[in-house]
Amino acid sequence: MSAENGSPGLPNGGVCCATDSGRCSLVGNKVTVVLGAQWGDEGKGKVVDLLAQDADIVCRCQGGNNAGHTVVVDSVEYDFHLLPSGIINQNAIAFIGNGVVIHLPGLFEEAEKNLKKGQGLVGWEKRLCISDRAHIVFDFHQAADGIQEQQRQEQAGKNLGTTKKGIGPVYSSKAARSGLRMCDLVSDFSEFSQRFKLLAKQYKSMYPSLEIDIDGELKKLQDYADRVKPMVKDGVYYLYEALHGPPKNILVEGANAALLDIDFGTYPFVTSSNCTVGGVCTGLGIPPQSVGDVYGVVKAYTTRVGIGAFPTEQNNDTGEMLQTRGHEYGVTTGRKRRCGWLDLVLLRYAHMINGFTALALTKLDILDVLSEIKVGVSYKIDGKKIPHFPANQEVLNRVEVEYETLPGWNTDTCNVRTFEELPENAKKYVRYIELELGIPIKWIGVGKSRESMIQLF
């Protein structure tokens, strides 16, 4: 085919550039990614909210309604679990990718709850787009999650501390190839019903105490199918068009965080999906060259919900102070978060996996009252420094953390709006983190509102 006839199969005039290797590479829009760099609850929602104001599409690529994001707009506090928090931007499309698992009652409940709070969600059904390849969480997945946790407690004396939202069981169904997807729900409902009954029976045989009202469930699912049908699209084609069409700002909102990743987190005390950068490609169906900036969100100290190793944890007055001042309670579970010092070993590890282009440092104001601040800089095992982050939980529980002590600033920073206005020692704390990690800090959070995010560049 001659050049003047153009290249076939390039939608919306996508440009084909010959590369050195002679292959054709598509030049198009790129996605901006926001990821948690610790154990979650870093304030990703706030960074997303900031970027979502200029976004055309805001995506979720993994997890389910086990995530919890809080966004404050015009003094109204919205809580998001499954919906991309960017849905409050009236001009953006909120896209739920194939890597996300969807509990339909939870989805509609969440939307309706937020609708009552303010104007942010008006017209949300017209702005939501769901990948037809996304798996569905059924009520029996959630019930099985609770039973599994109970069994772990009885058999091993400890559970995983899951949110009981059915996330583990539905990803298990997906891997076992017995799961059902949005495309099944919105096409032939009688075929869907047969497969649903089969899956329900399998769960009943695995968990005899499970009570499943099959007909009642199917009746509800049929109602949801009618409501959700206009939102369901071929996600791969939809994003391909968006990436290779006219200029667009596409934002990806990561749920959970690096240390909760199924592969790279503190296994087994992790979630059931990849919440590191690889999950963006597999959870949306986009190639790696479509990934642009990757922003890591880091709390100025460290928190963790539930059990699992936590090297810099402070079971003392400092930990209690961070917990109280930081209002450290989980958005999804209401559980108290464990608190400790910032851990640079953990952050270097998160950076190795994600390749952060810049960081957002949140909740710096919580440290305002401290006269000195410690930062974990290295780990030792049996007196020897180790260069890596241990995979084995028993080993991680045994590490001895070496700390660097930095001077505090004993000054209220809540009303600071530029980097220059920060107390000298607060600036030093920020620059120290940048230097140690080799990643620039782009934002600093000193409060709950949109305005309290200081942008450095």
Curated annotation (Swiss-Prot):
GO terms for cellular component: mitochondrion. It catalyses: IMP + L-aspartate + GTP = N(6)-(1,2-dicarboxyethyl)-AMP + GDP + phosphate + 2 H(+). Pfam families: Adenylsucc_synt. The active site is at residues 41, 69. GO terms for biological process: 'de novo' AMP biosynthetic process. The keyword Isomerase does not apply. This is Adenylosuccinate synthetase isozyme 2 A. It comes from Xenopus tropicalis (Western clawed frog).
